[in-house]
Amino acid sequence: MSSRENPSGICKSIPKLISSFVDTFVDYSVSGIFLPQDPSSQNEILQTRFEKPERLVAIGDLHGDLEKSREAFKIAGLIDSSDRWTGGSTMVVQVGDVLDRGGEELKILYFLEKLKREAERAGGKILTMNGNHEIMNIEGDFRYVTKKGLEEFQIWADWYCLGNKMKTLCSGLDKPKDPYEGIPMSFPRMRADCFEGIRARIAALRPDGPIAKRFLTKNQTVAVVGDSVFVHGGLLAEHIEYGLERINEEVRGWINGFKGGRYAPAYCRGGNSVVWLRKFSEEMAHKCDCAALEHALSTIPGVKRMIMGHTIQDAGINGVCNDKAIRIDVGMSKGCADGLPEVLEIRRDSGVRIVTSNPLYKENLYSHVAPDSKTGLGLLVPVPKQVEVKA
Amino acid sequence: MGQAQSDENSIPTTTTTNTPPPSANSPRDSEDTSSPSMDSLLAEAAAYGEDDNENESLEAKAQRALDCPCIADLRNGSCGSQFSEAFLCFLKSTAEEKGSDCVNPFVALQSCINANPDAFSKSVTGDEKETEKKEEQPPVQDHRIIPPLWAKDPPRSGNSKL
């Protein structure tokens, strides 16, 4: 049996080895990152409820700004200067909207994926969630895409297809699926120089697309962690009644391309959907529907607050409705308000506070606006500030 | 299809600096006995080989792997030598992040591909199964997408900011 010109069992493993080599090479070429091995088993059911960890950090909308994303992790002591996880057993929830408005969307997806794996090893955990911009992009709604955003996906597509060619040359590997299958070469009423970028973006992000499948299927749409429920826009009682686990599984199934076609389930579309709702995140406190919020919260046993992104809070992270609604989208991305990164921290023993890089809240209130104010631990402001008037 | 034409493809070169200290900072890792990631993929693969020689050096194993007939096309293409080096390095890598100790050969392979975009196309390597036309034969699906304003043609007045 073993008397070929190369009498080695090793040749049997080559297709598998080539495949992982090519994947690693493509990842590196796209992101500059070598991912550590994935410690989590694939295809496990998406978890919806989690015990309250010792330390929980919540991070708002990132919108294609890698630098600000890094800062957000840094001010909470979650990564070091070379982006390695230093958060130990901390649990992080990023409430969605990684995509759109900036040009480093894929780099952030890779950055988060790498940290997820490192955190897992250290006993920590990072949850990432679907925001309305994830849903829109999967659906082909590219209204908030930037030029750089098209370029980055184009680069991904080029390397991805090259990787497929390499795999095709290795006899013994199945012919990889063409990511562009069924995508038109041109689009009406669109500039011709955008066709390629748009095609790449559709290929990557449509249901069952390689990027959607690889990264976005791991996102929760709702998550209960201890006494907090996380969602990008907001939850109404009807959503909770429908079933949080059911929502997570259905959205994930849709992104996987299993069923549902192009468009997301109804509770992800429109103003009252879980990723679009603003009833609890209006900046003006008096516009928030505290009654609806309390009603919704009362239907999830043990939960006393809802933590949301989606609506930019010019005044920084804050709480309304007796801090039952905590709003953490500080518009940090350059493509949004270019806001100062702030994150929310909940410790099991000492409650809720805000970690900010805003120099105003630094130790010496009026001393200096230090140029280094963006690094290091910001002052921890006790209890979410109650903000009623917008600046 | 013009792949890999942009300079930005080589961006990763700049991120090469922080070569990781192998698994230095995972405090909870200590009791993880097996830690399979620290073996090279090659050693792992060889362990399943039917007639594997335990005493053979990793280097020799890697060389033997390179001689496998099924990768002849990859090895002989116009970026064949860069491929071989990168693949060899990857096989031998014992880093936590497989391949992270192979930045140089990876970058060399990238540059070669940037200079020879068709390095791994079938036609180049003499395989003529390329007869299938590159048109889009599968039916084009419904892809009515909503483009960003700046990509519309003709351009909209009231230009929105990006």
From Swiss-Prot, chain A:
Matching InterPro entries: Calcineurin-like_PHP_ApaH (IPR004843), Metallo-depent_PP-like (IPR029052), MPP_Shelphs (IPR041787)
List of catalytic residues: H133 (proton donor)
GO cellular component: cytosol
Hydrolase listed as a keyword: yes
Protein name: Shewanella-like protein phosphatase 2
Function: Shows phosphatase activity, hydrolyzing the artificial substrate para-nitrophenylphosphate (pNPP) in vitro.
Enzyme class at the top of the EC tree: hydrolase
Binding-site residues, Mn(2+) 2: D97, N132, H232, H295
Annotated cofactor note: Binds 2 manganese ions per subunit.
The protein's Enzyme Commission number: 3.1.-.-
Classification of source organism: Eukaryota, Viridiplantae, Streptophyta, Embryophyta, Tracheophyta
Compartment(s): Cytoplasm, Cytosol
SUPFAM superfamilies: Metallo-dependent phosphatases
Induction: By infection with the bacterial pathogen P.syringae.
Keyword Hydrolase carried by entry: yes
Binding site for Mn(2+) 1: D61, H63, D97
GO molecular function: manganese ion binding; phosphatase activity; phosphoprotein phosphatase activity
Expression by tissue: Expressed in roots and siliques (at protein level).
Transmembrane segments: none
Keywords (A to Z) from UniProt: Cytoplasm, Hydrolase, Manganese, Metal-binding, Protein phosphatase
From Swiss-Prot, chain B:
Subcellular location: Mitochondrion intermembrane space; Peroxisome matrix
Entry GO CC: mitochondrial intermembrane space; mitochondrion; peroxisomal matrix; peroxisome
A GO molecular-function annotation: protein-disulfide reductase activity
Main location as per UniProt: mitochondrion
Annotated segments matching region Disordered: 1-61, 119-162
Keyword Transport found: yes
Disulfide-bonded cysteines: C68-C70, C79-C112, C89-C102
Extent of motif Cx9C motif 1: 79-89
Consequence of gene loss (knockout): No visible phenotype under normal growth conditions.
Motif (Cx9C motif 2) on chain: 102-112
Keywords annotated in UniProt: Disulfide bond, Mitochondrion, Oxidoreductase, Peroxisome, Protein transport, Redox-active center, Translocation, Transport
Function: Required for the import and folding of small cysteine-containing proteins in the mitochondrial intermembrane space. Involved in the mitochondrial oxidative folding of the copper-zinc superoxide dismutase CSD1, the copper chaperone for superoxide dismutase CCS, and subunits of the mitochondrial membrane respiratory chain NADH dehydrogenase (Complex I). Involved in the peroxisomal oxidative folding of the copper-zinc superoxide dismutase CSD3, and the fatty acid beta-oxidation multifunctional protein AIM1.
Protein name listed in UniProt: Mitochondrial intermembrane space import and assembly protein 40 homolog
Organism listed in the record: Arabidopsis thaliana
Gene assigned in the entry: MIA40
